[in-house]
Amino acid sequence: GYAFKPPPRPDFGTSGRTIKLQANFFEMDIPKIDIYHYELDIKPEKCPRRVNREIVEHMVQHFKAQIFGDRKPVFDGRKNLYTAMPLPIGREKVELEVTLPGEGKDRIFKVSIKWVSCVSLQALHDALSGRLPSVPFETIQALDVVMRHLPSMRYTPVGRSFFTASEGCSNPLGGGREVWFGFHQSVRPSLWKMMLNIDVSATAFYKAQPVIEFVCEVLDFKSIEEQQKPLTDSQRVKFTKEIKGLKVEITHCGQMKRKYRVCNVTRRPASHQTFPLQQESGQTVECTVAQYFKDRHKLVLRYPHLPCLQVGQEQKHTYLPLEVCNIVAGQRCIKKLTDNQTSTMIRATARSAPDRQEEISKLMRSASFNTDPYVREFGIMVKDEMTDVTGRVLQPPSILYGGRNKAIATPVQGVWDMRNKQFHTGIEIKVWAIACFAPQRQCTEVHLKSFTEQLRKISRDAGMPIQGQPCFCKYAQGADSVGPMFRHLKNTYAGLQLVVVILPGKTPVYAEVKRVGDTVLGMATQCVQMKNVQRTTPQTLSNLCLKINVKLGGVNNILLPQGRPPVFQQPVIFLGADVTHPPAGDGKKPSIAAVVGSMDAHPNRYCATVRVQQHRQEIIQDLAAMVRELLIQFYKSTRFKPTRIIFYRDGVSEGQFQQVLHHELLAIREACIKLEKDYQPGITFIVVQKRHHTRLFCTDKNERVGKSGNIPAGTTVDTKITHPTEFDFYLCSHAGIQGTSRPSHYHVLWDDNRFSSDELQILTYQLCHTYVRCTRSVSIPAPAYYAHLVAFRARYHLVDKEHDSAEGSHTSGQSNGRDHQALAKAVQVHQDTLRTMYFA
């Protein structure tokens, strides 16, 4: 297909006051030499990278005299090998045999080497200085392999990061998991220079420990002695969910620590689990695992009442008693962390900006790339100081309120408040109900009465008067009572505007309230935690009002019209799009794509579209239909056809820019043409990324903001650490509260509207101030944030009462075999809800 090429950077931004920053990018000095690229083929294939690296290391040693001499080749763990001097093998394929001393017996591998190409670093210099149109990908890949070769041998690589268990101190998370600290490293092209991006990071790993201890952690036993009888069904299911897919090693064969992958946990204990055993006579008998271990390994099991692990391939019937297995070290946890684990993780890893800066500098000193023999072999030098870069702090927009005084708020450090201000368009609430799902003894009628009074007072002040007492206020229990109660409300009270639902902490009731309210009956619902009813604060009540007003069709505030950038001179629609994927380990659940579109000129109100699509599919499959719906809705709301479409796309990684742009830009165009054959609004396609490792720090201590010492809200960078030729920028639009702020990265993949840098940066920053759920600037533009909320809400709509709890299904991770149509129907929002911001 025809490749769309992202536009060149139009200019550099100049708006705002300048600020001196340091970025965690380290300049690389790269010689203008050629690098020699060889392809390796290792047989048997499918070895883990770690093993491949060992093979190559042995090969280089063993064939030093014949082939490698003093060269120090670097290897990517798969099939790419690079050298600084050509190998004396010409263009022919060379076949070698390499022996790895193994556990028990040696393993023999066949390796073939063949020359692929010369990678010119001169071409890279030309691209970075803008003399060549695009940066050659294979050069960056080669440099990346050089920089990673040594750390890959020393540490446990995960993606682009390296981890190692903390020396001396462990950071347990519970449930058999612990925190490992490490660092991210990637080679990035920037204007004039290659940069090494280095950041500290942390992730959850499984603790290397006996499986018996793992069981205790997962099932909350003080010790295994508490469990004298077989596991119950629910215990076994929970344990299976945690251990399935992990690697274990056996301890009962001396030095032969064979490793296996767990595919299941047996229903029967080791004393009863049988398998077909071939006897010497040739006939097979059924033998129990416990008996086999006694006869074969002279091992009397201590815990014959516990189940076995089924390992290897399902059909092979290999069973291991728990007590002879250990969890293999260095396995990253890809399953979702529990809430407790997540908060423990954040406590262990959140660092104020200055602390993080110091840690990164410390890391650079200990990594000491300039003494790395492989890096030196290729003549590369890395500066050990962070890169200085000049940023700009943009002016925040003024925020216009309504009511009598039409007050104007001016954000300071990304924050403003509603004191003495009224909603731009407040909704009068006449008919409303309360449904309390918290137990009456904990959340008493006195609590409810005082909560109602406080809420009404705050709502009056905010210009969204709740007139009169609720028409209905009853207690209820359990998710099953939601449907009948809501039906009764809808049928009994004409003109019912809102149901306030009080919840006792985490509960399946929430998912059911949203399923019934959003998709079945089309009723506006506002949930409140019991603790916020028992003791109210002006802050929580005010936040509730922000959400309620919007759900009922109100407008909380708008950008001051005369302060908006020129793009607003013609009708423009803002679209936000996101795809969310199910947590890892759920093979069957669908991905959810959401697209929202602005419905007024402020822009304040948004309309949502949502679809289920194939598991882990990154591209929005049904985008044309979704955009079409939004354009029609925009026309109905405003009586205008947008002349411009500004599309903020979240959740795309760099490797997918091309694919996503190609498919989705065409889809947006198709949506327009299908509405009217000559309808061709200008499209600007911007990818928003939060998941990257660029961190910015204030050079001047006096510029640091707040306890966490972060850069000020509005800090923008579009030089030195950004792309050499394309249109991208960093913008930190929010005030960092905890840890180190991540500036969001914006990459313009298409622009029919010919934005200047200033205009697009200011527009983006202003849109970060239009998020209705709080009176602060958020980290990404409101439309992108809303798309995320819509997809997140759809996850709740998919929760199946019969099978899942909202926290995750305890069936074997499938969407209970519901077919695509059923899932599609489940996320379809009710007609009456469609035009409201139900997701707020």
Curated annotation (Swiss-Prot):
A GO molecular-function descriptor: metal ion binding
Xref: Pfam families: ArgoL1, ArgoL2, ArgoMid, ArgoN, PAZ, Piwi
Sequence positions bearing 4-hydroxyproline: 681
Sites bearing Phosphoserine, chain numbering: 368, 805, 809, 812, 815
Listed GO biological process terms: miRNA-mediated gene silencing by inhibition of translation; miRNA-mediated gene silencing by mRNA destabilization; negative regulation of translational initiation; positive regulation of nuclear-transcribed mRNA catabolic process, deadenylation-dependent decay; positive regulation of nuclear-transcribed mRNA poly(A) tail shortening; pre-miRNA processing; regulation of DNA-templated transcription; regulatory ncRNA-mediated gene silencing
Domain notes: The Piwi domain may perform RNA cleavage by a mechanism similar to that of RNase H. However, while RNase H utilizes a triad of Asp-Asp-Glu (DDE) for metal ion coordination, this protein appears to utilize a triad of Asp-Asp-His (DDH).
Family membership noted in the UniProt record: Belongs to the argonaute family. Ago subfamily.
Name of this chain's protein: Protein argonaute-2
Organism: Oryctolagus cuniculus (Rabbit)
